[in-house]
Regions:
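Short acidic/glycine-enriched loop/turn segments that link adjacent beta-strands
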Residues: 34-36
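Residue-level signal for inorganic ion chemistry
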Residues: 19, 76, 95
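Conserved catalytic cores of phosphodiester-cleaving nucleases, focusing on short active-site segments
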Residues: 40-59, 76
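Domain-level recognition of nuclease-like catalytic cores that cleave nucleotide substrates
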Residues: 86-120
Length: 120
């Protein structure tokens, strides 16, 4: 597994733990369709949340959440539609971004998490 894949998996696990601590239940990880992948699918009492996890080593190239481009948003929407067609739910769908920074060796330090609800 490459360095970015390892860091990405670590980031998704950190985001899942954060969401669980906020009262969400993780119902799916790395859901794939022909349009793309959704990192996490979580739910709370009211919402079924499609979560894009973003992390960066520094802010020199912008904030992590700024990398969720319009093209990426469209891929996430299409992938969420595939999920919803195959999973019956009465909950309102929502798209969130969980963003934070992580450098090599920082994986053991508590990092501030930004949870952007209804991001797009």
């Amino acid at each position: 597994m490459g360095k970015s894949n390892t860091l990405g998996a670590w980031g998704e696990e950190k985001a899942a733990r954060y969401l669980t601590g906020q009262g969400y239940t993780i119902v799916e990880r790395n859901f794939h369709s022909r349009y793309g992948e959704i990192d996490l699918i979580a739910e709370n009492q009211d919402f079924l949340v499609f979560v894009e996890v973003k992390l960066r080593a520094s802010i020199s190239h912008g904030l992590p959440e700024e990398t969720v481009t319009l093209r990426k948003q469209e891929k996430l929407r299409l992938t969420a539609e595939v999920y919803l067609q195959n999973h019956d739910t009465k909950k309102q769908p929502r798209f969130d971004v969980v963003a934070f920074y992580a450098k090599d060796g920082m994986e053991t330090y508590p990092l501030p998490v930004r949870h952007i609800k209804n991001a797009f």
